Amino acid sequence: MSELFSVPYFIENLKQHIEMNQSEDKIHAMNSYYRSVVSTLVQDQLTKNAVVLKRIQHLDEAYNKVKRGESK
């Protein structure tokens, strides 16, 4: 298992979300996951801003890698 909130973690979860939502377009499934995670991170009052920013950066990097078809 990848380190929590790392790029590999988000890549793994994006791919799982796509697989679980095969009836949807790949980009639509990715966008759904992305919005859900960002919303959760933004609402987390216990996490410092720098930590939230780093998590969102990792999510964004993972999103772009999965979209381009990269695996790591």
Swiss-Prot record:
InterPro entries: Uncharacterised_YvfG (IPR018590), YvfG_sf (IPR037247). Pfam families: YvfG. Transmembrane segments: none annotated. SUPFAM superfamilies: YvfG-like. This is Uncharacterized protein YvfG.
